[in-house]
């Protein structure tokens, strides 16, 4: 496989007269993340499972009567759905407003921003860059727009990073970005950092098993 090529060409010598075929190799990261996410869901506390199975209403702060979308979303205790046609500013304006509002709520707040595709995550990174909001992106450099590769975690920590410096970098960065598949496959992130708010952009396009355990 090109992703993890055979390093010892001597393996092929006994079969040098054979014919070979090149085929697509489907990685198991996405499938494994789905299974892991489902496991997290079925082992989660019953109130959480009841919420996602529509067995109870999502909770919100009853004191908030504001018609402002940001105030209503940030007052939600379980989840808040923002629905709108493409091109109506859900990422460029609404998401930015939510991020800025949560960060302004206190220095102890931190956010996890996700989407299904790397292209959509690029859009989130573009919004954060325009808003001058510091962030780290978890993911592969091969699937990240060159404009944002300096904010990839692997690049930000440098070549001489230690476990302590990596923990400090995560602790000191209030916004973490990645695809749902990548974040699901890096569960150690949740043992190193606690998030006050998670936002999934374009969530309606994502199969439930990809996000039900996040």
Regions found by a protein language model. Give the residues of each.
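Motif I (Walker A/P-loop) of helicase-class P-loop NTPases
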Residues: 91-100, 209
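Conserved P-loop NTPase motor core of helicases/translocases
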Residues: 9-15, 53-56, 104-198
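Pre-ATPase regulatory/linker segments immediately N-terminal to the P-loop/RecA-like helicase/translocase core
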Residues: 1-75, 126-130, 138, 145-155
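Walker A (P-loop) phosphate-binding loop of P-loop NTPases
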Residues: 87
């Amino acid at each position: 496989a090109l992703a993890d090529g055979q390093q010892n060409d001597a393996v092929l010598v006994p079969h040098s007269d054979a014919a070979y075929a090149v085929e697509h190799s489907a990685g198991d990261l996405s499938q494994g993340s789905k299974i892991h996410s489902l496991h997290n869901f079925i082992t989660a506390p019953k109130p959480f499972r009841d919420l996602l199975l529509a067995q109870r209403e999502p909770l919100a702060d009853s004191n908030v009567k504001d018609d402002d979308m940001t105030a209503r979303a940030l007052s939600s205790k379980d989840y808040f759905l923002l629905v709108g046609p493409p091109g109506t500013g859900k990422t460029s304006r609404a998401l930015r407003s939510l991020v800025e509002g949560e960060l302004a709520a206190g220095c102890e707040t931190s956010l996890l921003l996700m989407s299904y595709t790397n292209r959509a995550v690029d859009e989130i990174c573009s919004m954060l860059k325009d808003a001058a909001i510091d962030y780290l992106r978890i993911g592969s450099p091969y699937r990240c727009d060159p404009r944002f590769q300096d904010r990839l975690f692997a690049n930000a920590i440098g070549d001489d990073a230690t476990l302590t410096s990596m923990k400090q970098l995560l602790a000191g960065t209030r916004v973490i970005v990645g695809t749902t598949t990548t974040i699901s496959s890096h569960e150690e992130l949740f043992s190193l950092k606690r998030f006050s708010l998670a936002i999934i952009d374009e969530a309606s396009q994502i199969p439930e098993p990809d996000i039900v355990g996040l």
